[in-house]
Every structure is written in C-alpha cells, then in structure tokens.
C-alpha cells in the first residue's frame, strides 16, 4: 500500500505517471542512481524520505487516525 514502486524513466530522462483520482502520491526522483519511485501518501500522517550517501534509501510513515 505505502511501498514505493519503481517507475520507468524514458531515454530523455522524463517520466510519465497517471494521477489516480482520490489519492495523493509522492514521486521520488533519484538523480544519483537514475531511478524514480512512486508511493501513496497516508490519509493522515507524515512521510519521511531518507537518503544514504545522497541516494534514496528508505521511506518512513507516521500514520495517525482521526477520532472524530
């Protein structure tokens, strides 16, 4: 659900990604490794993108639930 999935990068270094109605998505572009990833943002919460030596390494979610 919140796991990043790799998306294709074209030869001219562009990406094409559909917008899914009703969703907020995050696109991570890693110029060091030449990769692109997309993941869904949680409905309520924070998303932290972590890097190691300048490259995309990890995604942490702090998810909350609205009580009322």
UniProtKB/Swiss-Prot annotation:
Pfam families listed in its UniProt record: PBSX_XtrA
Organism: Bacillus subtilis (strain 168)
InterPro entries according to UniProt: PBSX_XtrA
Source taxonomy: Bacteria, Bacillati, Bacillota, Bacilli, Bacillales
UniProt protein name: Uncharacterized protein YqaO
Family under the similarity heading: To B.subtilis XtrA.
């Amino acid at each position: 659900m919140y796991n990043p999935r790799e998306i294709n990068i074209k030869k001219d270094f562009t990406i094409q990604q559909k917008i899914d109605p009703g969703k907020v998505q995050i696109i991570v572009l890693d110029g060091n490794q030449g990769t692109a990833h997309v993941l869904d943002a949680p409905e309520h919460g924070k998303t932290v993108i972590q890097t190691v030596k300048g490259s995309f390494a990890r995604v942490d979610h702090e998810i909350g639930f609205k009580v009322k």
